[in-house]
């Protein structure tokens, strides 16, 4: 029995190491991180999405600090994905269709700096892909200026536990919030 369990554990570790080589992270801010988390967790190849904060200087910020104080942080999601199943460009395209790239005040019913849209790039290739996608969107929308920030990624702080998987864990409250914000209808109007 011990030998059998040892073989199972070894097999698991080998598989995990093989998969770990294909795992990547990327970071997007798009207003309410609950809504962003829901959209990205449904994408094939995405293994996990974590709600959190990025872009500011305050270490380990809380939701109240990010929302009500000038921390410089944005509500951000960390996307953990298998690059063999979905790549950065695919995630970038999904990102655009889940935000209003022309809203400089925030996103939908959430206004303020912490709700602004931001793409955090990790290397020059990602930065170039983001810049190219912005040009394509501005062309598609007859020159309307995209106001989404492009920032170099520095640090990510996970949000409090009650924010994680909020759309699943607090399903009724989340649906009421989402309906009140009319996010889905507004996205349809922008991207149809």
Specify the residue positions occupied by each region the protein language model found.
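Bacterial N-terminal signal peptides
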Residues: 5-15
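Flexible coil/turn and secondary-structure edge motifs
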Residues: 18-192
